[in-house]
Amino acid sequence: MSVSRRELFTKFLGGKTAQKFIAPPYFCGEFNCVDCEAPCVSACDRELLSLENERVNFKFKSLGCNFCKECALACEEAGREVLNLKFTAKIEAKIFIDVHSCLAWNGTICCSCQDVCKFRAIDFLGVFRPSINQKCTGCAQCMEVCFANSIKMEAL
């Protein structure tokens, strides 16, 4: 596991690392959540959003995002533009497959992740060895159906 220079100096100098977060879909790139009552959080019927340190954060629980736009509409109605429909319906996160626990990687025929992905973001080498390609939107629908909980999400 490689350590970045920033992480090395932060540890060495006793500093705190910035908390990583996953921006939700339609994120404009800037936060304006100070004194906000977070209508986007309550608008998400799948409970995927939270407000932490005056930032809206995407957190996968048990259901993936269906890009219903309700969070962005609620944000715009509140006079904020943190979530705005002009921006991409993509969740900027790293989605990856834990090959040690993945059923397909370990010889069991399973393609539940590929079946549910409407973006065709999961490729298979034959019937085994799934991988996530560049079409991934970070919606986490594949995480929702993975029996072995082998699909993981990390902040970039």
Indicate where each model-derived feature is located:
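Non-ligating segments of multi-cofactor redox enzymes
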Residues: M1-L156
